[in-house]
């Protein structure tokens, strides 16, 4: 016999115990990051390595968001300077296309970024959708979540109540949906705009500039920033996603009294 003697119940018990212990530990987190795209994973990585208890909530079964495809059906992705410094730290190889513009493999960057966030200590609830937010004393205090496939079932045949998870801070890194912020906007608690037409150069700068707290306890990062503030669409380039996630982590880290690391200067600006 090649493998150890283990039966079906042993396997199920191992999965169940691991899930239970992780979920129980993160019923109360320092930070809940909603969305496991490039901005969310970067924020989770930076906060977790600084010592924060971080939970990532992702509606899909996979992590990485749009990083798997760089545009249309093609999987090379582009990064504009100075964001390649994060690729240097992740040890993701890239090539210079022209001064200030770099190209790398999307699946490799997605895998490396997800691995780094998890290695730093962040936990993930995948196949988990945001249903609502917890607001207490005019401050976001957590999220309300459910199993993602529930939303695809007719109301007539299912009634599955969501559950609440608390956190000191929530990061809306849900991309074009900006779903966390829009839950508040639907109630008139914040204003949320619509995405403008594409303008890569302007959009990336503005996304990083506008990354921040949109409501007490809620920080918006990544393309969700463009959606909330009506910024130009940035198109298939990812530098602002990485730097926005890093900035979100730094802002929250400062509030929590944590020293959040920022990547070193780029190895190359060629």
Curated annotation (Swiss-Prot):
GO MF annotations, alphabetized: cysteine-dependent adenosine diphosphate thiazole synthase activity; iron ion binding
Keyword Acetylation: no
Sorted UniProt keywords: Iron, Metal-binding, NAD, Thiamine biosynthesis, Transferase
Annotated glycine binding sites: 233
Pathway(s) per entry: Cofactor biosynthesis; thiamine diphosphate biosynthesis
Modified residues (2,3-didehydroalanine (Cys)): 159
InterPro entries listed in its UniProt record: FAD/NAD-bd_sf (IPR036188), Thi4_fam (IPR002922), Thi4_prok (IPR022828)
One Pfam assignment: Thi4
Keyword Metal-binding: yes
EC number: 2.4.2.60
Residues noted as binding Fe cation in the record, renumbered to the chain: 161, 176
Binding site residues for NAD(+): 39, 58-59, 66, 130, 161, 223
GO terms, biological process: thiamine biosynthetic process; thiamine diphosphate biosynthetic process; thiazole biosynthetic process
Top class in the EC scheme: transferase
Function according to Swiss-Prot or TrEMBL: Involved in biosynthesis of the thiamine precursor thiazole. Catalyzes the conversion of NAD and glycine to adenosine diphosphate 5-(2-hydroxyethyl)-4-methylthiazole-2-carboxylic acid (ADT), an adenylated thiazole intermediate. The reaction includes an iron-dependent sulfide transfer from a conserved cysteine residue of the protein to a thiazole intermediate. The enzyme can only undergo a single turnover, which suggests it is a suicide enzyme.
Record family assignment: Belongs to the THI4 family.
Protein name as annotated: Thiamine thiazole synthase
Source organism of this protein record: Aeropyrum pernix (strain ATCC 700893 / DSM 11879 / JCM 9820 / NBRC 100138 / K1)
Phylogenetic classification of the source organism: Archaea, Thermoproteota, Thermoprotei, Desulfurococcales, Desulfurococcaceae
